[in-house]
Amino acid sequence: MSVADIKKAEIVSQFQRAQGDTGSPEVQVALLTARINELTGHFKEHAKDHHSRRGLLRMVSRRRKLLDYLKGRNPDSYRALIEKLGLRK
């Protein structure tokens, strides 16, 4: 397993609802947050990488939609996820 696969498996195991759960909104948001944080660091070095910036904006939008869905379906889980990931101040 590569480093990315190990990190991904660690994130999935931390946020999954049940064993083998990879599709719940909590897991998806956590994985997107990790990728967004990595790309944010990338842009500190490569400020003119507009192609990757477009991908970043798509990921942020997708995470926002998943968070809105989770907030409507399960507000307690939403609050716990926000707290755990440190997304809101």
Swiss-Prot record:
InterPro entries: Ribosomal_uS15, Ribosomal_uS15_bac-type, uS15_NS1_RNA-bd_sf
GO molecular function: rRNA binding; structural constituent of ribosome
One Gene Ontology CC term in the entry: cytosolic small ribosomal subunit
Keyword Mitochondrion belongs to the record: no
Top-level taxonomic group: Bacteria
GO BP terms, alphabetized: translation
PROSITE patterns membership: RIBOSOMAL_S15 (PS00362)
The keyword Transferase is assigned to this record: no
Keywords: Ribonucleoprotein, Ribosomal protein, RNA-binding, rRNA-binding
Pfam families: Ribosomal_S15
Subunit structure of this chain's protein: Part of the 30S ribosomal subunit. Forms a bridge to the 50S subunit in the 70S ribosome, contacting the 23S rRNA.
NCBIfam families named in the record: S15_bact
Function (record text): One of the primary rRNA binding proteins, it binds directly to 16S rRNA where it helps nucleate assembly of the platform of the 30S subunit by binding and bridging several RNA helices of the 16S rRNA.
Family: Belongs to the universal ribosomal protein uS15 family.
Protein name: Small ribosomal subunit protein uS15
Gene: rpsO
